[in-house]
Amino acid sequence: MFRIVLASASPRRRELLQSLGLEFEVLPAGVNEDFAGRDPADMAESLAERKARAVAGRVGDGLILGADIVVFQRGRFLGKPEGPEEAAAMLTALQGDTHEVLTGVSLIRMPDGHAVVDHERTRVHFRAMTAQEIDWYVATGEPLDKAGAYAIQGLGGLFVRGIKGCWFNVVGLPLPLLSGLFRRQGVDLLNLVGTNWSSSGRR
């Protein structure tokens, strides 16, 4: 069985891979994410590769997947809010405006350590939100562990007027880009998905 290791503790990335029927292991990587002032695409790719490399030494053979998401609006990075007040401030800035979500993805092949890395960029437009709506959403707790203080696949989707680009990217892992990175590493992800999908009885 081909070994795939996800170097991330993100439940969203785990759920997306599981939705494909892939078999994989999770080995979270502890990486400092303070890269303020850098180009957002470079930041996303660098963090993704650092996560994958932090785990690579523990994997003898297989592919290690690292990913990191960056929310960028008008020259400012919006990470995970430190509390309800910061979450409300982020949502106040996002409402009625457009921002960018970039996800860096790195795939390292072991044992030779060959790495490929790329990123996906999606533009997201929020509708106008009232102060009451922002307070309500923050009170649900959903924004508190999310970059940009929202989850498009959850209640946060109620406030998204539209996107330009990959929806999976905003969730946390751009699947079309991931498929391309697997091909660059000499692995056809479609074959892995097809085998596991059939054997698990999915229809």
From Swiss-Prot:
Catalysed conversion reaction: a ribonucleoside 5'-triphosphate + H2O = a ribonucleoside 5'-phosphate + diphosphate + H(+); a 2'-deoxyribonucleoside 5'-triphosphate + H2O = a 2'-deoxyribonucleoside 5'-phosphate + diphosphate + H(+)
Keyword DNA-binding: no
Task performed by this protein: Nucleoside triphosphate pyrophosphatase. May have a dual role in cell division arrest and in preventing the incorporation of modified nucleotides into cellular nucleic acids.
SUPFAM superfamilies, per database record: ITPase-like
Signal sequence bounds: none
Protein name: Nucleoside triphosphate pyrophosphatase
Natural source organism: Desulforudis audaxviator (strain MP104C)
HAMAP family in the record: Maf
InterPro entries (alphabetical): ITPase-like_fam, Maf-like
Family note: Belongs to the Maf family.
GO molecular function, one term: nucleoside triphosphate diphosphatase activity
Active site: D68 (proton acceptor)
EC number: 3.6.1.9
Pfam families, A to Z: Maf
Cofactor: a divalent metal cation
The entry's keywords: Cytoplasm, Hydrolase, Nucleotide metabolism
GO biological process, one term: nucleotide metabolic process
GO cellular component terms attached to this protein's record: cytoplasm
